[in-house]
Amino acid sequence: MVFNFQGRAQIYLPEPFGSASLARRMSSLIDLTTQLASGRELTADEVEVAALALMTTEDSDEVKADFLAALAGKGETASEVASFARVFRARAVDPGVQAWASRAIDIVGTGGDHAGGFNISSLVVLVLASAGAVVMKHGNRGVTSKCGSADLLAGLGVNLDATPDKLRRALDELGFVFFFAPGYHPAFKNIAPVRKALAARGQRSVFNILGPLINPGRPAHVLLGVYSSAWVPKLAAALDSLGTGSGLAAHGVIDGQRGIDELTTATRNRVQGFGRLRDISAEWTAEDFGLSLSPFADLQGGDLAANLELTKSVLAGRGPQGLVDTIVLNAAIGMWIVGLRPTVRDGVEYARELLLGGAVARKIEATREFYAS
């Protein structure tokens, strides 16, 4: 079930195509696959043709998979990714939160790093909301991890099936919302089997990195964790092209070979800005912000039960120091991005106070009460 911005049930139907148009579209997807195999970049119009074909059931899953594999084999460009994002943004369910979007931030990761880390971004959301920021998080249940952002936030009391009207009230009363991706992107329905088949054979596709670019709330600011260093400049450029107000794309390098889709105190972090921060291109470490380097083991998470217990430990001041500092660092960066603090360093101690001083625990309790009512 999905909802329109007034909270009424809405069913998505692909736009109709006549038989001649359909034939052209089917041949176009095959033709585009051939062009990709030769190394040619797709235009925005060609991306739209391909995206529309992927949304329907007219092309076989094999044809769709061949196209996505050819695109990945060529290597998706920032322009192609931005063009795909525009198509799917236009077909997302509108939650009607435009009044908050210009002040809002999304704290999100691409996933897919297989690092087994804790749901850092979920607690960062709660710190930022406690600081007075407006947060619009967009995500899903765990796919390559045992516990995704949706899993943890649901465990903390968030109703994943809340109507847009309820979510608008959450923005007023809690300062944050979570857009559960399956409820806002019905156009993905006919793509899901293809993605599953590709994943089964270890093949990534553009859809592995598209989620953070198609938040239905359209927040003006984004702090994006990226699973691969090579994708940092591409996704920053794509978000810049999409008109994002400000933000950073970041990738943490664990030991020179492994990486994580987080900015952490245990890694050297490649960062690239976009929007107002587009001139930032740097490598950051914890020490740049007055924090200590930590072992990566401090960031490890588990399944939902384990992560809920770890959340309790963090809030009680018993969590691993590296995990606490990483949550604090990301929250401080988020505050700086949205303008709540003039520098990241200025936000570090404030974020720590909110996390460990009871404000986040109170936010979680308020969240449970809000969604239970």
Descriptions of predicted regions:
Residues 141-158:
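Active-site-proximal loop->helix
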Residues 27, 36-81, 91-99, 326-327:
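N-terminal glycine-rich anion-binding loops that anchor highly charged ligand groups
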Residues 32-35, 90-93, 117, 132, ...:
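Glycine-rich anion-binding loops and their surrounding alpha/beta cores
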Residues 75-139, 143:
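Active-site cofactor/substrate anionic-group-binding motifs, chiefly glycine-
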Residues 66, 123-127, 326, 330-333:
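Short amphipathic alpha-helical face segments that pack within enzyme cores
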Residues 26-40, 107-113:
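N-terminal basic/disordered segments at the start of proteins
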Residues 1-25:
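N-terminal amphipathic/basic-hydrophobic helices that include classical n-h-c signal peptides
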